[in-house]
Regions:
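Low-complexity, intrinsically disordered tandem-repeat tracts enriched in small residues
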Residues: 7, 13, 20, 95, ...
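Conserved hydrophobic beta-strand positions in leucine-rich repeat
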Residues: 65-69, 87-89, 106-110, 127-131, ...
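Canonical leucine-rich repeat
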Residues: 77-80, 97, 118, 139, ...
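Leucine-rich repeat
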Residues: 80-84, 102-105, 121-126, 142-147, ...
């Protein structure tokens, strides 16, 4: 296994992270440690973790707002810098995602994965969610007050909660297994597509 040596530079301080014990004195070194641990985890399944680590390091060191980790065959969510508000994870092999620590995200593309479980931050800044072509049976978007656009077609959705997404304008739920859909609070809705369901 190739050891990924992660160097993160933040606030004029440099942290060289290998397999040493995490430095808990600063958020910066803790992030670098978690990134190194994630990058060094070998699953022998064709994942391009080294490429992902390089892109994450660049986003972290340059305080970038956008991060593209698409088409890397990733099976686990890596640590995401807090400056990132637009995240592209399209076309990977992700199954279970937890974004509760990523409250700064506003735009997220998770299309064409294998996601069956996902958790979003409570009252996040999410405006655009692309989660089409996955394996979701339920989707809970409670407290997602900022959501404007949701693309969730081609899943196995039987249940969806968008009751708090009153700013929602665009909703695509085609090719799911929904038997009912409550849109009573979606007064801003401009475009709805929900064909090939059980409604």
């Amino acid at each position: 296994m190739t050891n990924i040596n992660t160097a993160c530079v933040k606030n004029n301080a440099s942290y060289q992270v290998n397999n040493a014990s995490p430095n808990k004195e600063t958020i910066s070194s803790n992030f670098c440690q978690r990134l190194a641990q994630w990058g060094n985890k070998s699953l022998n399944n064709g994942e391009e973790r080294a490429i992902a680590v390089e892109r994450i390091k660049e986003a972290y060191n340059l305080n970038m707002a956008s991060l593209d980790l698409s088409y890397l065959d990733l099976s686990e969510l890596p640590p995401i810098p807090s400056t990132v508000n637009t995240l592209n994870l399209e076309n990977n092999c992700l199954t279970c995602l937890d974004f509760t620590d990523n409250a700064s995200l506003a735009n997220i593309n998770l299309s064409f994965n294998k996601i069956n479980t996902i958790t979003f931050p409570n009252e996040s800044k999410l405006e655009n969610i692309y989660i089409d072509h996955n394996n979701l049976e339920s989707l809970d978007l409670k407290n997602q007050h900022s959501l404007v656009n949701l693309e969730a077609q081609n899943n196995n959705l039987k249940k969806i909660n968008i009751s708090d997404s009153y700013k929602l304008k665009f909703l695509n739920l085609n090719y799911n297994k929904l038997a009912s859909l409550d849109l009573s609070r979606q007064e801003s809705l401009i475009e709805l597509s929900a064909h090939h369901n059980m409604i």
